[in-house]
Amino acid sequence: MADVMDERIRAIQITSGFGFTAGAFLVALSLFLYPSLPAANETNKILEILSKQESGGWMMLHATLVLGFVLVAIGFTGYGFLLHLKGSSGAASIITACAVIGGTLWAAFLSAEFFVHPFIMNLASLEPGLGTMLFTLYWFWKLGAIALAAVLLFTAVAAAGLAGTSRGLQPVWLGWGGAFFAVLGIVVYAIDFLSAGATGAPINPLRTPFVRFAVGLPLQLWLGAVGVMLMMEWANRRPVNASAGGRRDTVQTTGRAPKASLEQTPSMERQRPGAAPAAPSAPEPPPLPPPIP
């Protein structure tokens, strides 16, 4: 069982490490290339900026974002399994649920941009009023969904950082650093949400450089650092079978128990299996007394 558990841990490490590293790179690259947009209620200005974007480039930008968030969700799911094996089942449940739901929201609403952009641009050129109305409805719905998705991923980062530090999976500076920026992101989104509820202004914290670079960039660096660390541990953690020179136990390869050597087998166990032990011979009768003369 020890070698099976070791193989599980190594599989989790390489899967989660690759998901974190590749996902963080794709998300950071996409957000760096993403144009700065005005407030959500300034629909005419948003449409003016989007009209200058090429449909193919806009679709590829969002496809890269979708792939990045899917890989990040896979990384968090694997990290949750790793924490579960270490005994932190509560934190693992929080991480897995938040990552799966948050990644699904990001992927679902960003993938709509694959076809919304050319559709809205064509409709706005024919029916400006109808195009603006449909775009406004979609845009507000999208911003609310991805705001919730961002808070869920922030929660996953905070739980992974704190639980990983307590279980020795991360150094203290890395775990607590990720948790700090994740909590900071949650606070910023909460303030923006409360402000939108009080003033009626639209929620869109991603349009500000502070959220995109002061909060988002450190978290993407955290994802990349955790991913690289997991892949390094995977590379340094040799399989049990490889360390044993490639020899595998007979139970694992043939399903039969290994045969003991004659030197390790007692004399009573050297008999053929199924043969009954020989009955002890009867004692010889005592010698007759000498004849009487």
Feature names for model-found ranges:
Residues 281-292:
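Intrinsically disordered, low-complexity proline-rich regions
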Residues 271, 275-281:
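A general signal for intrinsically disordered, low-complexity N-terminal leader regions
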Residues 2-262, 266, 274, 291:
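Hydrophobic, aromatic-enriched alpha-helical segments typical of multi-pass transmembrane helices
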